[in-house]
């Protein structure tokens, strides 16, 4: 870490005593735990332009949510930009990802308990009153299609231009928008004491289509009837159809 960045961090969170890379690293940024005289913090850093934009968006979302205390997310402490990299500082939260918790679970009974907790946690988010200032200026799906088109033009998406055209022309019937996470996979929620308790990677939090969250939430166990039933014991609002699941998980998510 260069001296300038270290100095900027210490202005926000106090003198740094220790810094270490986390065992679990995301695909879009480098994540470090920092211990200072004021406590434990998380530093996310990225040098890729697309992911720097996501970090900036996450900083704006966390800042608003820290001010309102409306959703279970890390506390925002600051955003730092350098010429070739961006950094966001937030509270370090105890817990492991649901992906890790499911991997470490001793049997299906424990896994089903975790998955039911995930369903309950997501259900609460989708029942939460919309948070001002982090709602998209246009329809959520219109915005995602537009962003996907930008990524295709820049060669930054796995999805093709043909797929995007299909998604644009064959949209699902609109539903009432709710607060959504926007990337609600098992990688992006934390588990503590056997319960899902916190959202991480908050860049996509806004008003949007709850079926997108639901589809990404079940993507890793969509063909396991017992696990799927456990999820819907907790998530009681709606059950996506096969066509809706394919649209959001097998289609739209290809671009993000």
For the regions a protein language model found, what residue spans apply to each?
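Short pocket-lining segment of the protein kinase catalytic domain that shapes the ATP-binding cleft
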Residues: 88-96
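Protein kinase-like catalytic domain
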Residues: 66, 122-130, 222, 235-239
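Generic structural signal for small/hydrophobic residues in well-ordered secondary structure
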Residues: 31, 62, 76, 91, ...
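ATP-binding glycine-rich phosphate-binding loop
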Residues: 13-36
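An alpha-helical support segment within catalytic cores of ATP-dependent transferases
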Residues: 2-11, 104, 109-118, 123-182
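Active-site Asp-x-Gly
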Residues: 52, 178-179, 192-240, 246, ...
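Active-site acidic catalytic loop and adjacent metal/ATP-binding pocket
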Residues: 27-35, 42-43, 166-212
């Amino acid at each position: 870490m260069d001296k300038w960045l270290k100095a900027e961090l210490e202005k926000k969170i106090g003198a740094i005593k220790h810094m270490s890379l986390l065992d679990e690293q995301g695909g879009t940024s480098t994540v470090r735990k920092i211990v200072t005289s004021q406590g434990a913090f998380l530093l996310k850093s990225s040098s890729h332009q697309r992911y720097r934009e996501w970090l900036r968006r996450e900083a704006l979302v966390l800042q608003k949510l820290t001010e309102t205390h409306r959703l279970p997310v890390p506390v925002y402490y600051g955003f730092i930009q350098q010429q070739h990299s961006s950094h966001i500082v937030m509270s370090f939260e105890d817990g492991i990802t649901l992906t890790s918790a499911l991997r470490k679970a001793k049997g299906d009974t424990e896994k089903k308990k975790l998955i039911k907790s995930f369903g309950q946690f997501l259900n609460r988010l989708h029942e939460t009153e919309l948070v001002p200032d982090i709602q998209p200026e246009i329809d959520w799906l219109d915005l995602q299609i537009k962003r996907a088109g930008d990524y295709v033009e820049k060669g930054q998406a796995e999805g093709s231009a043909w797929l995007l055209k299909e998604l644009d022309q064959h949209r699902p019937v609109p539903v009432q928008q709710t607060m959504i996470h926007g990337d609600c996979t098992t990688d992006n929620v934390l588990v503590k004491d056997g319960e899902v308790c916190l959202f991480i990677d908050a860049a996509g939090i806004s008003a949007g289509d709850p079926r997108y969250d639901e589809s990404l939430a079940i993507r890793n166990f969509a063909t396991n009837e017992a696990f799927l039933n456990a999820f819907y014991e907790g998530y009681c609002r709606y059950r996506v159809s096969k066509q809706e699941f394919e649209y959001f998980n097998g289609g739209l998510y290809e671009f993000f």
